[in-house]
């Protein structure tokens, strides 16, 4: 410490210059997320968005925030930081689209004990990539350097997304009825849930993140587990434009089918799912075998191969499937809406997972 000039903020562990340099580095990434309604420029005290410029007439705003859980620990341990930002965006915007809302803008929070500009820039680039895929603007964020609160290279993330839907088009609808069909959209793998259990399986088996993934040739275990969460926004917006047949959507995250599907059901209804219809990605079978995890625990922890579920009228299911395929999706018929059982869970399973 320079006693003549006194103690500085940098000597206390916070480097303002590094933070400013980071902002300059990420500005091109942020600008690339521009869209109607937002110029995606950094530097102001707050981000701006013009709903009229985005084409909305009588919108309802929908907001969501989320994180990526302990998946971020795998990014830190492998040094692969370029896709964890995509996960962050996906977890937020998928929660908007299930209510019928088009994602409009996004803000992020990055917290660490010591700012590593290259790491932070890689994370923000991933966030910008996710925003571009979702069609929303990255209009601001916060980088917090907090020495003593985080150790080593640890960091954490939070995301905040806002979307809009025209009044009268909110989901879920109130006309869900027995006989409606469930259509599932495939996940890319684990997405961003269950990683505390994943890390326990890795630790118990002495598995190396740098070693080959036993179930996915050509990738390391770390690369495979860090496969980013799918963003379902564009295909679902395409479906909304093509047909008015979607009654409800559910983002399958922590808690699986039995926790997330009832959130969109009216009272008096349940769901019957055929587990044998699922094309379960190999990572889930590997985890179940290596960890000795029962099917019931897999179902309540992971998405098991389905990241999004649509509820549609039986007689309009083919139209929705056609629109989904035109958008590049491969929908799977999972089951149907049934009258709620008098006792027991509202989601019942038939068949078995192919783990």
Curated annotation (Swiss-Prot):
Primary location recorded for the protein, binned into one broad class: cytoplasm
GO biological-process terms attached to the record: 'de novo' IMP biosynthetic process; adenine biosynthetic process
InterPro entries: PurM-like_C_dom, PurM-like_C_sf, PurM-like_N, PurM-like_N_sf, PurM_cligase
Keywords, sorted A to Z: ATP-binding, Cytoplasm, Ligase, Nucleotide-binding, Purine biosynthesis
A cellular component term, taken from the record's GO annotations: cytosol
Catalysed reaction equations from the record: 2-formamido-N(1)-(5-O-phospho-beta-D-ribosyl)acetamidine + ATP = 5-amino-1-(5-phospho-beta-D-ribosyl)imidazole + ADP + phosphate + H(+)
Family (UniProt): Belongs to the AIR synthase family.
EC number in record: 6.3.3.1
Protein's pathway: Purine metabolism; IMP biosynthesis via de novo pathway; 5-amino-1-(5-phospho-D-ribosyl)imidazole from N(2)-formyl-N(1)-(5-phospho-D-ribosyl)glycinamide: step 2/2
Entry's Gene Ontology molecular function annotations: ATP binding; phosphoribosylamine-glycine ligase activity; phosphoribosylformylglycinamidine cyclo-ligase activity
CDD domains reported for this sequence: PurM
Alphabetized HAMAP family for the sequence: AIRS (MF_00741)
SUPFAM superfamilies linked: PurM C-terminal domain-like, PurM N-terminal domain-like
Location of the protein in the cell: Cytoplasm
Protein name: Phosphoribosylformylglycinamidine cyclo-ligase
Gene label: purM
